[in-house]
Amino acid sequence: MSTNQDNFKKIISHAKEYGFIFQSSEIYDGLSAVYDYAQNGVELKNNLKKYWWASMVQMNDNIVGLDSSILMHPTTWKASGHVDAFNDPLIDNKDSKLRYRADVLIEDYIAKIQSKINKEIDKAKKRFGDAFDENEFRKTNARVLDNQKKIDNTISVMKKCFDDDDLVSLKKLIDDLGIVDPVSGSKNWTDIKQFNLMFSTSIGASSESSSEIYLRPETAQGIFVNFLNVQKSSRKKIPFGIAQIGKAFRNEIIARQFIFRMREFEQMEMQFFVKPGTQSKWYESWKENRMKWHKALGLGDENYRFHDHDKLAHYADAASDIEFNFPFGFKELEGIHSRTDFDLTQHEEYSGKKLRYFDPEINESYVPYVVETSIGLDRMFLAVLASSFKEEELKDNNTRIVLKIPGFLSPYKLAILPLVKKDGLSEYAKKIYDDLKIHFNIAYDEKDAVGRRYSRQDAIGTPVCLTVDHDS
């Protein structure tokens, strides 16, 4: 087992033991890829929401909030393209019986080759020191050139497969690259099939009168159908944005890696409406803005990178992910997408209602273009948890876990600890606690030796402990 895999298992175990995350319905053996946020987890999650909302809505005069419903008219999802195009290309390994997304298998293959390039560059940097010219090295080193050619060719073929909706050629690419099952090492693959990810349910008083609707697979459509209502009632001029935090649901067949990929999850999204022709400028602006926001959290600049999309969603003309270095490698944390006017135009067509903005500066009406920023809140939670998880060695050769969560995100900002329960210390400590708890979230603990109480607070990420002793 690798160090990262071992560490990830410890993080998952710690999350349960210290009240951050529980398996949903655990007494009934749980429900796969569905989790509950426990007493400390819900506080951390709420702090992440508050921080994002303050920075996105409170600090921006041209962004307002919305809380749209989970259930929407079913035609919404026909218009958005989800009914016909919200699919994952899935492939099974005949030997391990495990199922994978075909595009992810290929992307992981590309990442391994990129890792080889990075190692060559790192070795050269150490060898040549300050005289090293990375650009020249990339242009002249035979191994780097060969590996880069493999990456470029693979991306080109994969893109053509998706553009042509050619699953046969996509399967051939996996075979030609010699991609193996990450678990079994087998190359014995089935054909690739598309699988729609939406959950359906019914609405109505009886089976005869009910109609099929969907649990929303994303929160964005609730913003788009309310675009004109929000714009007119808030009297906002373009460019302006609408932000939302809410639950979404996807019938993920391949739901692994703890809370990274779940069937019920939460998104923090902002749709920014702009004048057609200016979307590229705003796309680059929001890319830069969002990366600055993430790095300001203090989780380590080296843990972030951009990954521009080669395969674009049906609504986008440009897309990039901010990836975070999770215990299982760099994976998507936030997506920034230039969605063009696809969504509003589609909803105009299917609803028969105009979704246009009248621009008084040019005296014209037009369908705005949209730049989207979308964070998976649960992934954000995991990024904070994983980067804050530290295992410290003690003098007696034992270890203890400390969560070094940024103070403004920690479940409790302060813990009040009476040194002992007698001599009036508990009463005095409780008075301090009662006076302060109205201002921010505080923990109070008087059980066990004070050293153990310090360790408990370290384990849940409390930044400050106030010990009430006889000199207080």
Language-model regions, residue ranges each:
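NTP/phosphate- and nucleic-acid-binding module
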Residues: M1-S472
